[in-house]
Amino acid sequence: MKSGRVLVVALLLSFSMGGAAAEKPEQRLGQLEAEVEAAADISAVMRLQRTYGYFVDKGMWADLAEYFTTDAVANYPAGVFIGKPSIREHLFRNVGNVPMGQVGLGDKRVYNHFSIQPVVNLDPGGQTAKGRWRVIAMFGNFGGSATWAEGLYEMQYAKEGGVWKIARLDYHSGFGAPYATGWVAPPQPAVSAVPAPRRPRQLAHPADRERDASCEGFPAACIAPFHYANPGKGAGSPVWTVTAKTSPASGDAKQRAAKLLSKARQLADEQQVESLLRTYGFYLDRAYWDQVSDLFADDGTIEFAQQGVYVGKKRVREFLGKLGPHGLVTGWMNDHMQLQPVVTVLPDSNKAWSHNREWAMTGRLGEAGQWTEGIYENQYVKQGGVWKIKSMHFYPTFITDYDQGWAKDAKPAPGPLADLPPDRPPSSVYAIYPKAHVPPYHYNNPVTLKPLQYPTVGGPSAREIAQAQASGETKSLEPVRDLKVAADEIERLVGRVKAVHEIENLSSAYGYYLDKNLWNDLADLFDPQLGSIELAHRGVYRGPKVREFLVKVFGRGGQEGPVAGRLGNHIQVQPVITLSADGKSAKIRSRMLQQMSQGARASWGGAIYENEAVRGADGVWRYSKVNAWNTFTASYDGGWTKAASSGMPGPNPELVAPDSPPTRTIAMYPVVYEIPYHYANPVTGRNSLPPLIPMAAQQAQLRAQATPAAPTSPASAPPGMPASVAAGLREIGAKIDAAKTTALYAPLHAALQHDAVATRRDLAYGPHERHRADVFMPKAPGAPRPLVVFVHGGGFSRGAKSSAGQFYYDNIGYWAAEHGLVGMTINYRLAPEFKYPAGAEDLDRLVAWLREHAREWGADPARIFLWGHSAGAAHVADYLARGPKAPVAGAILTSGVYQLGDTVSVWKDYYGEDVALYPQRASLTRLIQVSVPLLVNWAELDPPDFIPDTEKLIAGRKAGGKPMVSLRLPNHSHLSETYAVGTADQSLTSPILKFIEAPPK
């Protein structure tokens, strides 16, 4: 067997259990029996929770009800259910909404329930255990609604009759959100509003009592209690700690050792198979078809949906080649997360099975993104000591366009390929969502050990169930000839199994601490001397600077803990863990998926981690290296194919200087770059990967694609605006449609690089958390420059200076710095919590602060220009109309409101319900008179409410001879006029530069 072929638990570890070497082999067996039993217990608990999620998926309530102890407590949002009978009735009648005894969801229903990111610990004594799991749920009805949910389970397990069951379930909600909007915070009620009383949910089976105290989750700021101590702090949080069994197992010493050796090998094999299927997912992401096909046995088979069966490694490779080119190309998103593995290894055999979930995010730049979710039922064979895929069968649950979601779109299962007919027809004929379909599972109920009770609607046939069942002959126990050799082998195997569990706990805890901004807890996961961290282009921080970096850069100088109204989920999954030969260090490849939200914008992000960990002298595993390779970031509105940003955060030397510069140059989707694997192919040892187009060439290609076509006419497409964008804006019309407008402009910004610009983020210009500014400065030295400050819109109650995964409004800051200015984007206090004149007061505070600090960024405090858009323009107008204490050099007003009507609700959120006060609060009359030079513009496709105010302002200033430049932007909309900043379309930016260079007098 060649080096590198065994991925996770190559059986080479020399694992010490204090003083074992000095004991006789017979004396060691009691401790080894306790260790192996503990390892088996952890495996059983994880199997229990993962299968729990699969049974919820398909409405298999009868099997699920068996998971609870007689006196179990289930603390759900709907209330607390006590005892197995009550929980059983809750599952059928409340969750399933079906009569007692009826299983299955029926057609047109999605109820996916991911159980992922485990931190599992066995309690002393081995009779109880605890686990923390993240839940991602997709609910919905075709033609009805679609909903996201995320939360945490804090579970308590207990052995009842020697079988692991759930003793207590506590669900802590993270968020629930409609698919249409994603995870954004709901509008906050007015300060004076009386909170509506919480009405208990009407249940078919009432709860036994109201729910126990729990973390309500986003947008509230709370932390679900951790059952474990910090895994890296002090003695850590061992996955188990056991003492030798005082009652030895039956049989003589060699018979006992033979049983232990068999079980230890089985547990180690389970982990190897888990890593094999996770490795498959990482190769699939990158379209490395050679590497994927290498994982199959020579006679292996592959079957996707209704496409038929391909037999043999060569045919597997041919089929994979039909999925796309060998290796990712620019603009191709192909993420395939492999989650929730349930692995069965037949004892003392070379056979194994797995059941796992795939969650895929795919698509091409500018086209519709696509969701796929489904189940793999695979078989494996061990040949020459190496596990290989014997058969792979993927059963999709649903396939749907990102733009529409699973309530509105449901694509059929792909059928046979006309240009590559399969070797055999599909194993079974079925339809996928919106039809109900339950694939056959290879395992029985892990509690009752009885066959599963499948739904009659969409369930598998008896033939399919029999074919899928894990079965086969097992060899008799291998006799032990040398007791010491056997004991050493058992010790080594169970030590490696334990190490993998503890490293997975470490990885999961990293994500949970990052979720809640627990920077010091996060820093405790690092080895204090050897630890290092490198994220994006921020540079490398080592040793004590890891904590300083986390606290000062991410914690903004000491902000610790969750913040109300902000979501920052860092979902850590799919770890491939490779232990060193001596068992003292490990390398870990894992995946991170982000769900982020602040204000009215939700976003996605992704990364691959290539980390390293060491086991200290105290036996505790800690990180020696964390290295994140960001892959994509995108707004929720447009998704990854239409609203992705390839920019990468750089160093923050003004906060904490890195110990060394970045070790690599990377750019996110739509650019594709090589992410190194710490391992060779686990089956063949292959290291070679298909070559990628250099990043610079990809960026040039994207810029070329973004080059505007010749306009069909000057009126339909201004110079620099691609004809496709012009047509898209015409189609949207006067509607403010952020998702569609973002989709038009995101590809143009994705091609842009800003290497000549330095940034400083989240500078505080006042005491409130919304008093924050980002500065964009040319790196090249020069004389003091004009400072242009952009004030965002958002209907007075939402919006931000920048949005995670989105180009706006960083595009304005970058544009300013690239044109010889200092750019700034700001946040300010929002309605309805803060009403008129809060916006003007914030600008007053800002300008005073700028006049004091502008020189720090190379800006001239005498040349400050305010640029407001929409509600931001109204705030700038109010600031000027009130008579600013610190005058500015000029102001740019883009599509603002200056004369208030009495029927627009968003104005009432900020300007108040008393419309009698509107005449004195409206800025128009005074704005006409101010002496500050103005550039006033509006867009041809602005909503009708905006245009009259602008026309009145322009007419009034012209009549009074006040300094002003005015312009109308043809074919632009309310959003596109700012989204276009930084692109080749200079309809607005060219006049702004001239205005700043020589303001009218």
Predicted regions and their residues:
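N-terminal cap/lid segment of alpha/beta-hydrolase-fold proteins
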Residues: 724-783
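C-terminal catalytic histidine-bearing segment of alpha/beta-hydrolase fold enzymes
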Residues: 937, 944-947, 951, 958-1001
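Gly/Ser-rich "nucleophile elbow"/oxyanion-hole loop immediately N-terminal to the catalytic nucleophile
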Residues: 783, 849-870
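A solvent-exposed, acidic/Ser-Thr-rich amphipathic alpha-helical stretch
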Residues: 61-135, 289-358, 519-594
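Short beta-strand edge/turn micro-motifs at domain boundaries
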Residues: 128-132, 150-185, 189, 240-244, ...
